[in-house]
């Protein structure tokens, strides 16, 4: 009986091995994101998460295909780096969902002549995407540990057109302004006046605004000194904090 049972087990295992290529399309390892190289995962991310949702700007798509997102997350999350979700990067902060990075970049309508200010450096990933498209990027991070880590990583990756500052993003970076575009990756309860003042004529700002659970991604355009506002989509970002530890 034992010999018969072992024979049956072997036959079942053999049958599973024979059927696997048909059940999983013949290339189960190649098509399963878990077994793919980072390059293939990145291409899959752009194709299924970004292009499939209507992002068409060629400069944005090219940047997303080039920048290695897995290098901007802790090692334990690298295999999930190209998934359709944010990931923790330490200090209670996250790297944004790839689609949101793409959307926020696209609505700014950037090119190689633009000077951009980013509020909330975080991992440095968004700054890298911007640097692939724009002339220069100034980015501010409140949390020193994150800012210094991002600055080193960006330098190691060869980005020479990114300036990193540790400071209060609400105040912007007046010395380097005005900016053709401003991108804010943390949510204040209102639009900071210093950032509006540092936006160049004709410039655009994309910013999540609202309280913890009710935020709207807003696109602002400065025209003849006045700010025009357009709602984009509901979002959820970490709150914009000041040096005193209080949310704006």
Short names for language-model regions:
Residues 2-14:
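Bacterial N-terminal signal peptides that target proteins for export
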Residues 4, 24, 36-37:
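Coiled-coil-like amphipathic alpha-helices with heptad-repeat character
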Residues 5-7, 20, 27:
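Ala/Thr-enriched low-complexity intrinsically disordered regions
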Residues 12-14, 72, 169:
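Alpha-helical interaction segments
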Residues 14-23:
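Bacterial N-terminal signal peptides
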Residues 28-117, 125-129, 133, 146-148, ...:
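Class I SAM-dependent transferase core
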Residues 109-228:
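Conserved nucleotide-cofactor-binding alpha/beta core module
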């Amino acid at each position: 009986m034992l010999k018969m049972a072992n024979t049956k087990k072997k036959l079942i295992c053999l049958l599973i091995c024979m059927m696997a290529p048909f059940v999983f399309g013949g290339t189960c390892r190649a098509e399963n994101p878990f077994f793919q190289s980072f390059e293939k995962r990145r291409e899959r991310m752009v194709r299924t998460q970004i292009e499939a949702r209507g992002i068409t700007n060629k400069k944005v798509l090219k940047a997303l295909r080039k920048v290695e997102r897995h290098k901007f997350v802790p090692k334990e999350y690298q295999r999930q780096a190209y998934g359709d979700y944010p990931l923790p990067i330490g200090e209670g902060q996250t790297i944004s969902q790839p689609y949101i990075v793409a959307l926020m970049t696209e609505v700014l309508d950037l090119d190689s002549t633009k000077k951009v200010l980013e509020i909330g450096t975080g991992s440095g990933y968004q700054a890298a995407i911007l640097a692939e498209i724009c002339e220069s990027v100034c980015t501010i991070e409140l949390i020193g540990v994150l800012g210094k880590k991002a600055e080193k990583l960006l330098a190691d990756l060869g980005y020479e057109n990114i300036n990193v500052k540790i400071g209060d993003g609400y105040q912007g970076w007046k010395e380097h302004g005005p900016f053709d575009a401003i991108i804010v990756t943390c949510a204040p309860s209102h639009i900071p006046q210093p950032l509006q003042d540092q936006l160049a004529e004709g410039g655009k700002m994309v910013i999540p605004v609202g309280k913890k659970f009710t935020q709207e991604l807003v696109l602002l355009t400065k025209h003849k000194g006045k700010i025009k506002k357009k709602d984009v989509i509901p979002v959820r970002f970490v709150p914009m904090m000041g040096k005193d530890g209080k949310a704006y």
